């Protein structure tokens, strides 16, 4: 849209981390481009790229963080809440251990927002991420809540976020364990109503398993009897 020259290197078209070290790749790309966006699994990869590229490196998604998605989500919440960010409450429900749960917790803590997570304790962010969030909240005045009760997590909230329960690359067998843990954390009409806020809005970074119109959605329905997974 802005007229930049963009080159896309897909996994099959690059030897990064395989036949060529991250360091060497960073140095070469840094001489060819004005900026690099990395979207992949390892947080350590994007950090090493940033150390050696000599140009700005953007995290487009890793296993730990999804900052570009969070910037878009913040803009959306600002546009649709009618409140300053510091007065806006939002809740993440589901598996909170990975990039979306981590990023939503930390950005809310940084910006002084009312930030909640509703998840089984086994699926909370790591102790290190939680400690970082509390440290940021002490400076910003953010209100943080981590609870295993999804009803408590959404009470009075302005936005309810969720994400898929099984990430790319995880084996199919994981579905059984995740669904057993997370059945009570699906975003349903009842959970939206539990917010007690007629203006509450739903957010998802997508793609979402919300019906039977995909192969996975149909398999989930036949196997577990669920029409939709994390949201219905």
Swiss-Prot record:
| Biological process, per Gene Ontology | arginine biosynthetic process via ornithine; citrulline biosynthetic process; L-arginine biosynthetic process
GO cellular component terms attached to this protein's record:
cytoplasm
Q: For this protein, what is any one GO molecular function term?
A: amino acid binding
Q: Where is this site: Important for structural integrity?
A: 79
Coiled-coil stretches: none
Q: What pathway is this protein said to act in by its record?
A: Amino-acid biosynthesis; L-arginine biosynthesis; L-arginine from L-ornithine and carbamoyl phosphate: step 1/3
**Protein role:** Reversibly catalyzes the transfer of the carbamoyl group from carbamoyl phosphate (CP) to the N(epsilon) atom of ornithine (ORN) to produce L-citrulline.
Q: What is this protein called?
A: Ornithine carbamoyltransferase
Q: Which organism is it from?
A: Neisseria elongata
């Amino acid at each position: 849209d802005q007229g930049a020259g963009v080159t896309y290197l897909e996994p099959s078209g690059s030897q990064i981390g395989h036949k060529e070290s991250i360091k060497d790749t960073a140095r070469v790309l840094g001489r060819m481009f004005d900026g690099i966006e990395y979207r992949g699994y390892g947080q350590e990869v994007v950090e090493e790229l940033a150390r050696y590229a000599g140009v700005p490196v953007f995290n487009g998604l890793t296993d730990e963080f999804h900052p570009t998605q969070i910037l878009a989500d913040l803009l959306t919440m600002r546009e649709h809440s009618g409140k300053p960010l510091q007065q806006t409450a939002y809740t993440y429900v589901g598996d909170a251990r990975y990039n979306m749960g981590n990023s939503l917790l930390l950005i809310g803590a940084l910006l002084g927002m009312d930030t909640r997570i509703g998840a089984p304790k086994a699926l909370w962010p790591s102790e290190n991420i939680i400690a970082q969030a509390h440290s940021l909240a002490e400076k910003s005045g953010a209100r943080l809540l981590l609870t295993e009760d999804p009803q408590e997590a959404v009470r009075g909230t302005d936005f309810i976020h969720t994400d898929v329960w099984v990430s790319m690359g995880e084996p199919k067998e994981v579905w059984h364990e995740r669904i057993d843990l997370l059945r009570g954390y699906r975003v349903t009409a009842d959970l939206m109503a539990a917010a007690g806020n007629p203006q509450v809005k739903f957010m998802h970074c997508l793609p979402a398993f919300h019906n039977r119109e995909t192969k996975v959605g149909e398999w989930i329905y036949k196997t577990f009897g669920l029409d939709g997974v994390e949201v219905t």
